Amino acid sequence: RDAACDWSSDVCSSDLMPRWGKVGKQKVEDAGTLYPERMRTVDEEIRDVALSFIDKAKKDDKPFFLWLNPTRMHVTTHLSPKYEGMRNADNDWTIQEAGMAQLDDIVGDVLKKLKDMGLDDNTIVVFTTDNGAENFTWPDGGQTPFAGGKGTALEGGFRVPAILRWPGKVPAGKVENGIMSGMDWFPTFVAAAGNPNIVEELLKGKQVGSQSYKVHLDGYNQTDMIMGKGPSTRHEVFYFTEGTLSAVRIDDFKYRFTDQPDGWIGSTVKLDMPVLTNLRLDPFERTGFTKGAQGSYQYMNWFLYEFWRFQFVQKEVAKVAATAIEFPPMQKGASFNLDAVKEQIQHAMLSQSGK
């Protein structure tokens, strides 16, 4: 992969990128190829850019939003001598532990910067990730106690850790079990910055600078929950695997419509009879219809008595489907399938012939 540096701009650029088209209001520079040797220390490159960004925001006396995405712990891991040297016979570390040590140092550098500049008590800091463990590439991809992993509709593919720090606002040491989605961060942050109505405003249409936006956000403002003032405002989670709605969670109950017996790299099978799981009672999804599943015979009896609940999931799916009429999906889900690649090539050829 190549690396790129992007800067937002007030000027709309007419430059064209071969893959993405018109650049728009940003400046893009080629930052070179990300060779395996460079992968050893690219996180330090990213960290330095982040620290410089904080310095500039402080100098300009402006609020800032920093989204820092180190490569650790994403496959494939190439360790620098410093972190490779942390592995020894006494600790028996794999590349996972050594890579996590590097990630810990990166996070520590950012927290130290905030403290040194007197910003730590007035800054919301969140540590989280975008998907569950990619356990089929262990040890790089990590491990999880939950069923499945990245790319699946099982809990191992969707559940992620989240740690939040906001001194004076978020109670220290508090553990919250309310349902929250990554889509909730945007409305929550905007509410914390002073606008709790951003979802409703964008739904109606909102002017931001010279740009007009009219979009449907699926996120909820969760400031009350994170501040310990109330429960989660979210009751439902939609589990999309690429473009397929594979499961829905409503409070404690999860309704799963597909199976992926070989994980993300295998085929997706549509189930004639959905699997119902009470995630409070069975968070690891060990029971179900699958041959050999624990308690599978007793599960059928339990399923019959809980079948009435499917009316709830039908209503939720109908609600989200209705939003797609005015706000249709902006793009198809990604796929490594050859048919999808052929479709992309054909689309590109048609676009070229129309010029």
Identify the function of each model-found stretch.
Residues 1-12:
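Single conserved hydrophobic/aromatic residue that forms the stacking wall/gate
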Residues 30-44, 89-102:
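The substrate-binding groove and active-site-proximal loops of carbohydrate-active enzymes
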Residues 50-96, 134-136, 140-144:
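Active-site His/acidic residue clusters
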Residues 59-66, 119-125, 159-160, 231-235, ...:
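Loop/turn elements at helix/coil->beta-strand transitions in domains of secreted/extracellular proteins
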Residues 62, 250, 255, 261-262, ...:
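Long, internal low-complexity/basic segments
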Residues 62-63, 69, 102-138:
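Metal-dependent active-site segment of extracytoplasmic phospho-/sulfohydrolases and closely related
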Residues 66-78, 127-133, 240-244, 327-340:
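Short, solvent-exposed turn/loop segments enriched in Gly/Ser/Thr/Pro and often Arg
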Residues 108-116, 142-231, 283-287, 292-293:
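Substrate-binding rim/cap in mid-to-C-terminal beta-strand-loop elements of soluble/periplasmic
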